[in-house]
């Protein structure tokens, strides 16, 4: 678990940043990890900002020096486990690097049991079997099979002729890859 909330003043203003000491520690630690092992890195703020995971223009939504972390993870199959956005999404950067940005167990800051992207409050479930990873989102108060909501034609003013679905354990692909 990395602390990438880097405070820049006394008024709780912070940016997403991994300090040099932590990067050096990761590099030394990875020297003992075989390249054929899965690597997981957990941190609060996402490594990269995507439109789909956009949070709040007033708060940092990416780690400013994430490329340094990506460089250290080259050669490994790596998964970044992040939060902060109160949205849910899985971003595939390339064949060996993926970020799982998991919605919040508190929903929208404990004010609603639904997150800002419509995902119910909940948490990620990750299962590792050797080098095989499976994951899914577990909505609080619902069975594990509860993975989306569908809305009938006519519900949306913007898309009145469409059936809409809010799927909260989807994959997003981004380029260029880190």
At which residue positions do the language-model features occur?
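Conserved beta-sheet core of the metallophosphoesterase superfamily
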Residues: 57-156
């Amino acid at each position: 678990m990395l602390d990438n909330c880097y405070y820049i003043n006394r008024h709780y203003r912070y940016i997403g940043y991994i300090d040099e000491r932590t990067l050096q520690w990761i590099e030394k630690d990875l020297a003992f990890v075989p390249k054929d092992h899965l690597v997981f890195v957990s941190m609060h703020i996402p490594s990269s900002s995507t439109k789909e995971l956009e949070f709040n223009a007033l708060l940092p939504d990416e780690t400013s020096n994430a490329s340094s972390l990506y460089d250290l993870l080259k050669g490994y199959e790596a998964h970044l486990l992040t939060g902060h956005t109160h949205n849910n999404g899985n971003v595939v950067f390339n064949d060996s690097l993926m970020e799982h940005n998991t919605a919040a167990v508190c929903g929208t800051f404990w004010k609603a049991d639904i997150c800002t992207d419509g995902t119910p409050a909940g948490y990620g479930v990750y299962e590792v079997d050797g080098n095989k990873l499976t994951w899914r989102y577990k909505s609080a108060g619902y069975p594990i099979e509860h993975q989306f909501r569908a809305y009938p034609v006519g519900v949306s003013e913007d898309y009145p002729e469409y059936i809409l679905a809010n799927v909260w354990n989807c994959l997003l692909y981004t380029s260029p890859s880190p």
